[in-house]
Curated annotation (Swiss-Prot):
One of its GO terms (cellular component) is virion component. Its main location: virion. Pfam families: P11_C. It is found in: Virion. It comes from Acanthamoeba polyphaga mimivirus (APMV). Keywords: Signal, Virion. Residues 1-30 form the signal peptide. This is Uncharacterized protein R489.
Length: 221
């Protein structure tokens, strides 16, 4: 009888343990399902509970510029007036606010106010004309010009033009040394006598000196 009672208690204990395990497993599953709700579920709940404001104004670029200028003015107003002086680091911001740079299409609106025309050619009160441009891009002036036509004229020909005695430059009158002859000792005036510049052989391979052989005897001498 005592053994039967022990078996009943063991069965009841096992059933209680299984019930406790099943209860905790079921509780964990419910918590996971609550955390995995989709975003649309929350958005629908929020839309039902919170009011939606449809009158929203998006600031433009000009509004942002005005806001930034207002912020700069508010910051400058908090400090001493010395921050607004010409030597302050905020002087450029103040100057930019005073000028509307976006309204300028170009550096000059009218040709009459262009000061560059009055300083043309380093002269005051002179304007550029179309003739000046044509003169600047003249092709004939870009080519090399001969400043002196008689630069390459022969000196003897130049003297023949201005001096009456033309025999000073006559080709029959010889001047200087005879460089055509073979030797100075036995010179010849025959152009066909020897080679004009004989060389001296200095090696068995036919090498010669650069200077002519002045001691060679001419064949026609």
């Amino acid at each position: 009888m005592a053994k039967f009672n022990n078996n009943i208690l063991l069965i009841i204990l096992i059933i209680v343990i299984l019930f406790i395990i099943f209860y905790f497993l079921n509780k964990n599953n419910q918590s996971n399902t609550n955390n995995n709700y989709p975003v649309s579920h929350f958005s629908s709940n929020v839309s039902r509970t919170l009011p939606v404001n449809t009158n929203v104004t998006v600031p433009t670029v000009n509004d942002c510029d005005e806001l930034s200028e207002n912020i700069v003015e508010s910051l400058l107003s908090k400090y001493d007036s010395s921050m607004m002086s010409d030597r302050s680091p905020f002087h450029n911001l103040v100057q930019q606010k005073q000028q509307t740079l976006r309204s300028y299409d170009g550096p000059y609106d009218n040709d009459e106010s262009d000061d560059r025309d009055f300083t043309y050619k380093k002269n005051k009160f002179t304007r550029r004309t179309p003739n000046d441009l044509n003169d600047l891009f003249d092709v004939n002036k870009m080519l090399p010009q001969e400043t002196e036509e008689d630069w390459f004229d022969d000196l003897h020909m130049k003297n023949a033009k201005h001096i009456n005695n033309t025999h000073m430059i006559h080709p029959k009158k010889h001047r200087g040394l005879d460089t055509i002859g073979s030797t100075h000792k036995n010179a010849t005036h025959d152009l066909r006598g020897d080679i004009p510049n004989p060389k001296m052989s200095v090696s068995p391979w036919g090498n010669s000196t650069i200077e002519p052989d002045v001691f060679a005897r001419g064949l026609c001498g």
